[in-house]
Amino acid sequence: METATEVATVVSTPAVTVAAVATRKRDKPYKGIRMRKWGKWVAEIREPNKRSRIWLGSYSTPEAAARAYDTAVFYLRGPSARLNFPELLAGVTVTGGGGGGVNGGGDMSAAYIRRKAAEVGAQVDALEAAGAGGNRHHHHHQHQRGNHDYVDNHSDYRINDDLMECSSKEGFKRCNGSLERVDLNKLPDPETSDDD
């Protein structure tokens, strides 16, 4: 016969496990990232065959940190890497760069990997920040910047690439779908101040 304590232990164990999993998902929703006490998300990755880590940066959103991690792990391990967002790098190959690359047979430098990962993370953070007050939607969309096409499947925001006039919002200047950082300490030109 079971005692009340044994029954309580059996019943509470799954609830504790579910709560622990939920807490872990909230604190670390993606591989290779963690949240600082003050709310910033950071990404880092261990170098292959070494004890040292490559610092990938600090980001406002977990998605930006996870995308930076994905970029770094893809450069280090190639197409066989376990990614947070594998659909974003499907069919992509690494060419050129820091020291030969995954396909070139050489090792990439940690600085090159850090730089590439930080670029991707910063782009995702900028898209998230630019869209925070704008047009939200939950669809996959494709952007074109110059000669580079990329698919942004995990952004909840849309940038209107057909926008012909420049508009300024939350410290960013948006012209023809591209974002520029506006210096908020600089006084506007008298000629163009009415246009913004």
Curated annotation (Swiss-Prot):
GO terms for molecular function: DNA-binding transcription factor activity; transcription cis-regulatory region binding. SMART domains: AP2 (SM00380). Keywords: Activator, DNA-binding, Ethylene signaling pathway, Nucleus, Transcription, Transcription regulation. It is found in: Nucleus. One of its GO terms (cellular component) is nucleus. CDD domains: AP2. Pfam families: AP2. Residues 29-86 bind DNA. Residues 135-145 have a biased composition (Basic residues). The keyword Transcription applies. Residues 132-153 are annotated as: Disordered. GO terms for biological process: ethylene-activated signaling pathway; negative regulation of DNA-templated transcription; positive regulation of leaf senescence. Probably acts as a transcriptional activator. Binds to the GCC-box pathogenesis-related promoter element. May be involved in the regulation of gene expression by stress factors and by components of stress signal transduction pathways. Belongs to the AP2/ERF transcription factor family. ERF subfamily. This is Ethylene-responsive transcription factor RAP2-10.
